[in-house]
């Protein structure tokens, strides 16, 4: 492997004309993007068009597990193509370091468009990927029994201003809590107690506010190390008022205060940039923005590398 950083190895990546042609043929033969994905042989595609990516992908996984727990890849050429082709290329790349998983259990959608959604039904509460407000650092898929280990965010159209990615290492949050000693007497509940995580309405089967779905899980465990999303827990307490106790509220406050104090990195994604995170150990968020055209693509991946 050349003597340069893993991130920079992707900066010279080119997309062969033959690769784009194959993707377009597959899309034309399918009724939908998701159906096209099911028809496509990603393994053969990568071996033929991007044979160098397998070894680079393995090196990236090692960095996610032993380094800073996130990697920023710059200037990928995927955003130069029409959106369906761009989504295909991002998905193909994602298979190099994990197994892409559906956005929710009863769907085959592997690529989620992160963009402000207009004309929402009355009373519908948008999830964080559907609005433009500030988003506190959180765990992706916190409301799933088994959150995916890796999350990739690819910038197709970044916001003109705002919309910056914020990253906090979960290990530093736990170190801060441990340093408090008796001042954080309720913090043991973060690992020994169960907290309610309500599934966002966008990811429920009925997509109705009056038919909620939730799980109960600890905030701190061995796998994932941290599971946290404040708005999801808050709405979970509304579903399970019997466990909305003073002790749980105090434990949650200890965690949230430590999150506020913890160092955070701020990343500005330009068009073509991809942020890859270890979702079990870091929290990621976003600053507010006012550009309705902002578009990111998200792919969640399990730890086992493989193809769809």
Where are these regions (language model features)?
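A short alpha->loop->secondary-structure connector
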Residues: 90-100
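Short secondary-structure capping/junction motifs at helix and strand boundaries
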Residues: 98-109
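Active-site environment of non-heme Fe oxygenases that use a 2-His-1-carboxylate facial triad
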Residues: 1-53, 58-59, 65-71, 79-80, ...
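Non-catalytic, well-ordered alpha-helical scaffold segments
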Residues: 87, 91, 147-150
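Short glycine-centered, acidic/aromatic-flanked micro-motifs in structured strand/loop junctions
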Residues: 75
């Amino acid at each position: 492997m050349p003597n340069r950083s893993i991130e920079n190895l992707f900066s010279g990546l080119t997309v062969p004309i033959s690769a784009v042609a194959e993707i377009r043929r597959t899309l034309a033969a399918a009724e939908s993007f998701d159906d096209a994905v099911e028809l496509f042989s990603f393994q053969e595609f990568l071996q033929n068009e991007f044979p160098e990516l397998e070894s680079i992908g393995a090196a990236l996984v090692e960095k996610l597990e032993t380094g800073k727990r996130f990697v920023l890849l710059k200037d990928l050429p995927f955003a130069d193509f029409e959106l369906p082709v761009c989504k295909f290329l991002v998905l193909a790349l994602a298979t190099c370091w994990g197994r892409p998983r559906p956005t929710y259990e009863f769907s085959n959608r592997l690529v989620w468009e992160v963009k402000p959604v207009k004309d929402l039904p009355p009373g519908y509460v948008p999830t964080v990927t559907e609005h433009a407000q500030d988003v506190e650092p959180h765990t992706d898929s916190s409301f799933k029994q088994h959150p995916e280990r890796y999350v990739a965010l690819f910038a197709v159209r970044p916001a003109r201003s705002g919309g910056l990615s914020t990253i906090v290492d979960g290990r530093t949050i736990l170190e801060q809590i441990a340093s408090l000693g008796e001042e954080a007497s309720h913090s043991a509940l973060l690992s020994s107690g169960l907290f309610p995580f309500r599934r966002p309405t966008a990811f429920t089967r009925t997509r109705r506010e009056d038919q909620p779905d939730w799980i109960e899980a600890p905030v701190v465990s061995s796998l994932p190390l941290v599971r946290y999303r404040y708005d999801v827990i808050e709405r979970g307490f509304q579903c399970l008022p019997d466990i909305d106790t003073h002790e749980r509220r105090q434990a949650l406050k200890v965690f949230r205060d430590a999150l506020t104090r913890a160092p955070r990195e701020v990343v500005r994604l330009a068009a073509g940039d991809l942020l890859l995170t270890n979702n079990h150990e870091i929290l990621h968020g976003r600053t507010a923005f006012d550009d309705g055209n902002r578009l990111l693509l998200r792919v969640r991946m399990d730890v086992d590398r493989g193809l769809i």
